[in-house]
Design a protein with these regions (language model features):
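Core catalytic region of metal-dependent phosphoesterases/phosphodiesterases
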Residues: 1-60
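Active-site neighborhood of phospho(di)ester-bond hydrolases with catalytic His/Asp-centered motifs
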Residues: 5-11, 29-34, 67-70, 86-91, ...
């Protein structure tokens, strides 16, 4: 199945890195990370195919309610609210998948692999509300 949406939880670091995601050929929704200093440059780079906002970003996609943030702040509060089917965060750069009650928590790790030496993404199947970590080469 084709990609319907790319969600990025921050730390593009530079606009040139963000532009590479246009090659995926699907829309992108993103939040700024703490290493995204060039905010206007990122907004401009993503404008042709996506958008980037200050976290947290709430969105509905394919019948699921998403919360996207860079740092997993107030995670217990968001989980207790039961308002979200999927919560995506990234600050630690460590891949993580877990389910808390009815909410799927996803940390895709880091695409670039600059800190951990491992380039990873998470792939979500919205029909089954399941995800897997994929290691890129």
């Amino acid at each position: 199945a084709a990609c319907k949406l790319v969600i990025h939880a921050g730390d593009f670091v530079a606009p040139f890195a963000a532009r590479e995601l246009e090659n995926l050929g699907c829309p992108l929704k993103a939040v700024f990370g703490n290493c995204d200093g060039e905010k206007q440059g990122l907004e401009k780079a993503l404008q042709p195919f996506g958008e980037i906002k200050k976290a947290p970003l709430m969105l509905n996609h394919q019948g699921l309610r998403f919360l996207i943030m860079h740092i997993a702040a107030k995670l217990d509060v968001h989980l207790a609210s039961e308002k979200f089917d999927v919560i995506i965060f990234a600050h630690t750069h460590k891949p993580e998948l877990r389910k808390e009650k009815k909410t799927l928590l996803i940390n895709p790790g880091e695409t670039g692999g600059w800190l951990s030496g491992k380039s990873t993404v998470a792939l979500l199947d919205p029909k089954t509300l399941s995800a897997k970590i994929i290691f890129l080469e």
